[in-house]
Amino acid sequence: MKKEIVTNENGIIKILNEFGITKPILEEASKMDINVPMLFYDKIINNPSAENIDNVTKNLLGVYGNYYATHYFKMQGYDVENEVGVYDNGNLLTRADISFIDSNGVRNYCEVKAAYQIIDNIRNYKDNSLEKTGYYKNLDAEIIKYKKIGEKLIKQVKKLSKDGSLVNVIIFDGCYMDEIIKQELKNLDANIITLNVNIYDLEENIKKNVLRILSYFSKNVTINIDYKGKKNR
């Protein structure tokens, strides 16, 4: 069977589209400064290691998380913006994943966390090692990559709420958030919203799709693209 020759980014996009990574997902990724075609080119097509497959999966998990959260608020009738700058005395402090004005005229900022767990760092891990204890000993080892997510979340919520805006933390079905983090968010007047999308199923499906795309490129495609000078996460 003659292999398909891909000579530009549009050729990669066409194949990604065929595997369900369509324009809305690519646009969401672009807002997050993630070039998905280049990501696949760098990590999957050129160097398909287990680490790179995991890297692409995690990047796409964040993209899909923002996509589903954006869709959720649009369905509520809100005029949603993504990656909105939050300023302090004219200086860029951070960016909100999602921003909208609610029915009371209040500015809302949203921080989306597509994670298995959001846990106080001290309780979560022992001696900063890869070994989990307590509640988490039976969870997948990949969860260790989220060990600092709770600490980062609290810092981000503090930044987002600095101007008095309402802050929503968006998590997904299956995500475990411990009571320490919940209390800290409550103290910051942040709301926790859980979307009815299971985080485990979402990541598993994304990874399966990444592997299918890898298999397709390996068997059916010859790549001849020069991405020289371009960078990706």
What are these regions (language model features)?
Residues 1-44:
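Charged, low-complexity intrinsically disordered tails and linkers
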Residues 7, 32-89:
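Acidic-basic catalytic patches of nuclease active cores, encompassing PD-(D/E)XK
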Residues 8, 16-17, 87-89, 102, ...:
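Acidic surface patches and DE-rich sequence motifs
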Residues 13-15, 107, 231:
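Short linear proline/tyrosine/threonine-rich motifs used for host-factor recruitment
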Residues 87-90, 94, 173-179:
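Acidic, metal-coordinating catalytic cores used for nucleic-acid/nucleotide bond scission
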Residues 90-112, 117-119:
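Active-site beta-strand-loop-beta-strand hairpin of nuclease catalytic cores
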Residues 112-194:
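Catalytic cores of nucleic-acid endonucleases
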Residues 162, 166-233:
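Domain-level recognition of nuclease-like catalytic cores that cleave nucleotide substrates
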